């Protein structure tokens, strides 16, 4: 069987594939991420969970003309690999390497610099309104997780978008977990939506979005078909996608908190490797924390 990923260096290459080829590509992309992150470290679980969604988005939408905004950026590894950075991916988060998050000066596909959560809806909405004002024929997509969407800034973006005619699609990547399991009333509501037991009116329709879903986020054929259909619908739209964080690596699916960013691990077994801390420089946050404690002790 011919390896597909090795022949993809741009989204144009991706869009030359048939829909029937996409599941094979998803398996290869997931394996590639696992093999690189096993030795180089990084945010594993989130990127494994959106492999199919990433492929479907770049397959259906005319990126980079159509603008795609990832919230936080933990899940952007597949996006980077498919948009011309496969050969550099081993330098991810390394000195003089590529960024671990979307970065505007790194690629035209990285439409917005991320790192902090809950900014994607406002950013994509601003781009959509700007395109409207300039008369540009562009589509705009924000991908946000179920933990990030519970933040105030996300609700501000939804609230604003709901009174516009902006051509905006918000995709909820619902895996019921951020770095830790999601909590709160919105999480309970989304759980009930997935079960079909919600008693309340649809919260997103109440904000003037057309709501679609839930959709299986690992069914490439269904995802691609739904995204293609939504391209023809004007105005604010909301697609609810159900995914599994850590998909494709048994341990990462089982312990989603630990495998959010597990450090080095065995790519075949998934077992986390013990660290030799003697050769590892301290992390910035640890230096900062210890410095604060030293200052507090002296004053």
Please describe what each predicted stretch is.
Residues 1-83, 205-209, 214-224, 230, ...:
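N-terminal amphipathic, basic-rich helices that act as targeting or association modules
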């Amino acid at each position: 069987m011919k390896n597909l990923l090795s022949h993809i260096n741009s989204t144009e290459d991706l869009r030359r594939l048939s829909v029937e080829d996409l599941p094979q590509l998803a398996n290869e992309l997931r394996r590639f991420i696992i093999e690189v992150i096993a030795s180089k470290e990084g945010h594993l679980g989130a990127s494994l969970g959106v492999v199919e969604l990433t492929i479907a988005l770049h397959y259906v939408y005319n990126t980079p003309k159509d603008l795609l905004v990832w919230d936080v950026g933990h899940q952007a590894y597949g996006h980077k690999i498919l948009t011309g950075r496969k050969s550099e991916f081993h330098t991810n988060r390394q000195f003089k390497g590529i960024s671990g998050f979307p970065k505007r000066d790194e690629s035209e596909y990285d439409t917005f610099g991320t790192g902090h959560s809950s900014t994607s809806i406002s950013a994509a909405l601003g781009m959509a309104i700007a395109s409207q004002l300039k008369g540009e024929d562009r589509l705009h997509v924000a991908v946000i997780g179920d933990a990030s969407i519970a933040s105030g800034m996300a609700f501000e973006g939804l609230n604003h978008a709901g009174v516009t005619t902006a051509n905006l699609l918000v995709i909820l990547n619902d895996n019921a977990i951020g770095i830790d399991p999601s909590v709160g009333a919105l999480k309970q509501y989304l759980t009930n939506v997935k079960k079909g037991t919600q008693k309340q009116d649809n919260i997103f329709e109440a904000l003037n979005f057309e709501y679609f879903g839930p959709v299986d986020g690992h069914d490439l054929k269904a995802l691609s078909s739904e995204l293609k259909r939504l391209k023809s619908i004007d105005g604010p739209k909301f697609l609810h996608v159900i995914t599994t964080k850590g998909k494709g690596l048994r341990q990462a699916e089982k312990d989603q908190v630990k495998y959010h960013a597990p450090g080095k691990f065995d790519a075949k077994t998934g077992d986390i490797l013990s660290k030799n801390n003697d050769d590892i420089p301290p992390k910035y946050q640890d230096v900062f924390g210890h410095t604060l404690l030293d200052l507090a002790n002296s004053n």
